[in-house]
């Protein structure tokens, strides 16, 4: 694995903006409101012909008593304790730490406590004085931070001042013996990509991912389609459906902060793990609510990031609450994924809370309500007890394989003859549609084009029959599929 460096500091000192700048992406949500980041996020800092290294963005540490940092998390409760735990785990994983401070606010007592705490870890520490907008301000704004006893560097994450120098200083903190790192495929699997997402009126996606979205140096990434690339699974669902609990249960870690408070997760967070020699990445996302219920700007950014994450995953895991049943928002999310032909499966979580006598009726109700997208797998699970969790990853891997299916044109046309012979298309306006040939236009998902004499005469039930037949003949049971009908005359011109 790559050597890692952690970004640690108080809330709102600019750690997430700095993280986005260093990895040249818009992964972390940034906002002027303190405490936006909660779960730690990881990315890769790359440079042309330069050694890559990992970087971890941690939540802002804020406690009622400054001494609590020096004494440890005992007695600290709520999100503050979980954020501190996440920061401690990040520091333990890293070879060095960047203590990020605010040059405009100056040295605060809490910064000194954090520095004292980091000194006891024995890790190399670099004090990064952020929000210093030019070289003329460096001496004035950084002078008092030298008292901390660590090397000091002034930067501006927002305007890019000294960021190349910062990268160089961070590389100097890396141990010489860790030169190899991991391969490109594994490295890319730990970075969340950025992709555009369509917006539906019932789902709030406005506002963008972060204020730094248009900054110079920010680039977009895409998920890898190669079969050997680690499987990426995106968790999606309403707030408090148990997405983070499922990630923790599936990976056997406490990687995600979990609480009964809806909206605990804000960023879309990658959690990589290995099982049976194979690598996987779960992307935990913020809960998606209806537009009318979103009043917080940070939540708007979080929802937008959640929906974008589905376009960057191989398979999306839509998590529902077994106790609450399917809500109108759940239905809208299912319809949205189905319309976009997103590979997904539905996980009905919290089955341990459903009385034993009511479980079968509850399962039947879920199946009936999801009858309109029969190809989508439906699993009843429990993050708390582990019920049916072992079925999730193998089924997701199967969906990914089905999405990559490529069928030769000759085989397709032989299948088309068999399907049409078995069931002729109905006569429409005194004319029976005539099929010429079929081809596969693309995969991801499988897309088939059938050329006929008049595409307008193909009715919806017969189109559904064609799709079901293709699924049966070629083993595409759960992946989304597109079937297009094109008009073609003797001159092979398309309408």
UniProtKB/Swiss-Prot annotation:
InterPro entries, A to Z: G_ENGA, GTP-bd, GTPase_Der, KH_dom-like, KH_dom-like_a/b, P-loop_NTPase, Small_GTP-bd
Presence of the UniProt keyword Repeat in the record: yes
UniProt GO molecular function: GTP binding; ribosome binding
Protein family membership: Belongs to the TRAFAC class TrmE-Era-EngA-EngB-Septin-like GTPase superfamily. EngA (Der) GTPase family.
Start-end of Acidic residues biased regions: 213-227
The protein's assembly and partners: Associates with the 50S ribosomal subunit.
Record gene name: der
Domain KH-like, residue spans: 405-489
Keyword Ribosomal protein (UniProt): no
Protein name as it appears in the record: GTPase Der
GO biological process: ribosome biogenesis
One Pfam match: KH_dom-like
Keywords carried by this UniProt record: GTP-binding, Nucleotide-binding, Repeat, Ribosome biogenesis
Domain EngA-type G: 3-178, 231-404
Main function: GTPase that plays an essential role in the late steps of ribosome biogenesis.
Region described as Disordered: spans on this chain: 190-227
Gene3D superfamilies linked to this entry: 3.30.300.20, P-loop containing nucleotide triphosphate hydrolases
Binding site for GTP 1: 9-16, 57-61, 130-133
Chain positions recorded as GTP 2 binding sites: 237-244, 284-288, 349-352
């Amino acid at each position: 694995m790559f050597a890692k460096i952690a970004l640690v500091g108080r809330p709102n000192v600019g750690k997430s903006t700095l993280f986005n700048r260093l990895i040249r992406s818009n992964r972390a949500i940034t906002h002027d409101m303190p405490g936006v980041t909660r779960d730690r996020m990881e990315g890769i800092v790359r440079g042309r012909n330069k050694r890559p290294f990992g970087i971890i963005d941690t939540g802002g540490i804020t406690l009622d008593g400054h001494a609590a940092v020096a004494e440890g998390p005992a007695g600290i409760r709520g999100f503050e304790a979980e954020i501190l735990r996440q920061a401690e785990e990040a520091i333990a994983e890293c070879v060095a730490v960047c203590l990020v401070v605010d040059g405009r606010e100056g040295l605060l007592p809490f910064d000194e406590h954090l520095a004292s705490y980091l000194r006891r870890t024995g890790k190399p520490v670099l004090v990064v004085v952020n929000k210093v907008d030019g070289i003329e301000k460096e001496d004035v704004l950084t002078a008092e931070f030298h008292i901390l006893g660590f090397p000091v560097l002034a930067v501006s994450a927002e305007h890019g001042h000294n960021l190349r120098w910062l990268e160089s200083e961070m590389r100097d903190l890396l141990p010489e013996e860790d030169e190899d790192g991991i391969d490109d495929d594994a490295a890319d699997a730990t970075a969340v990509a950025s992709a555009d997402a369509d917006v539906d009126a019932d789902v709030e996606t406005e506002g963008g991912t972060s204020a730094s979205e248009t900054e110079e140096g920010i680039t977009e990434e895409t998920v890898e389609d190669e079969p050997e690339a680690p499987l990426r699974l995106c968790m999606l669902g309403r707030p408090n459906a148990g997405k983070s609990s499922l990630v923790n249960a599936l990976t056997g870690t406490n990687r995600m902060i979990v609480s009964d408070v809806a909206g605990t997760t804000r960023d879309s967070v990658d959690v990589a793990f290995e099982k049976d020699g194979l690598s996987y990445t779960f992307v935990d996302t913020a809960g998606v609510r209806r537009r009318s219920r979103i009043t917080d700007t940070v939540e708007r950014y979080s929802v937008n990031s959640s929906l974008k994450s589905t376009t960057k995953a191989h398979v999306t895991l839509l998590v529902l609450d077994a106790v609450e049943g399917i809500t109108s928002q759940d239905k809208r999310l299912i319809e949205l994924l189905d319309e976009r032909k997103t590979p997904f499966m539905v996980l009905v979580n919290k089955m341990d809370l459903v009385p034993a006598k009511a479980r079968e009726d509850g399962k039947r109700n879920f199946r009936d309500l999801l009858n309109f997208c029969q190809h989508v797998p439906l699993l009843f699970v429990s993050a708390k007890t582990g019920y049916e969790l072992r079925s999730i990853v193998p089924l997701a891997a199967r969906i990914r394989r089905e999405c990559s299916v490529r069928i030769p044109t000759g085989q397709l046309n032989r299948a088309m003859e068999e399907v049409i012979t078995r069931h002729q298309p109905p006569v429409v306006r005194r004319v029976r549609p005539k099929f010429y040939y079929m081809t596969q236009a693309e995969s991801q998902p499988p897309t088939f084009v059938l050329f006929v004499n008049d595409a307008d005469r193909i009715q919806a039930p017969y189109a559904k029959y064609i799709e079901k037949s293709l699924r049966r003949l070629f083993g595409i049971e759960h992946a989304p599929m597109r079937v297009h009908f094109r008009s073609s005359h003797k001159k092979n011109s398309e309408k």
